[in-house]
Amino acid sequence: LHASNAAVIDGGTITVKSSVEALEGTNVTINGGTLDLYATDDGINAASTATGAEIFIKITGGDIKVEVGQGDTDALDSNGDIIMTGGNLAITSTVSAFDFDGKASYTGGTITVNGQTRTEITADGPGGGGAPGGQGGGPGGH
């Protein structure tokens, strides 16, 4: 699913069984719904070449499963920020759960990566970014 600017999911059921990038836009907001995404590259991708573009992935609700293939892949890849305030995010990835160039904020919801609970969002893949002080967003702003 590709949006040239904002991709906003407010509800419903979305299943992507095979894709290169399952859900992408300049910014991606998931407020609710059930998403089951599989990608051979990035599961959810926020990127833009436009100067000054507001680039982010924001999850406020929903039940989201993201599985990515092997290689240089990221479950969530943002050229800006990753923000999570609610919802349930279950990631299956052999390489990288999160890759971001901005900051990470995790104040609510649940995150599991390969069945293990995460208490913060950290860039963990090859070339994993995160601006200085941007890594380690955890519940309660930690």
Residue map of PLM features:
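A composition-driven surface/loop motif
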Residues: 1-142
